[in-house]
């Protein structure tokens, strides 16, 4: 595999300063013509860099298509906490390093293109915090692959020209209980994450519940 593989370039680009995520579902009365026209309009209004597009399993099925490995989320049977499913038929990741207001208007324009067949069910505003830390202050994305390894990790290959270069996305909204987290002492906070906040070093004897051991894919 070479680095010339086709990918939506925003997938491998650095995390932008500002972002907006839109989840959309099919309208119950949307017919095939409306869906087709909406998707054609979407393709003409997105570039894969400033706007990244994902298709949900239900939409792919509605289009009488098949993507091996694509499926809707279902909570693990052994889950000990509530893990609700929030499926979407379309997922849009709008990216900008300049103006969050421009993202608002771009999102409105895309929603208007899609309105005959899709409705926005969730919209999330995002930003890059302190050059790549999550809101608890720990570095985010430490183990993300880079260079050719990133391409090899992100891109589908050997599935034919229609699928090669595509990617899978698993979207997980998290709520930070910051007041509760801040109430712990520094050592406890580091053990919860599995890394030391001051130097980002992984803790060898971190407990099995540590974040670093549960979020690797």
Predicted regions and their residues:
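Long, histidine/aromatic-enriched segments associated with O2/redox biology
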Residues: 1-217
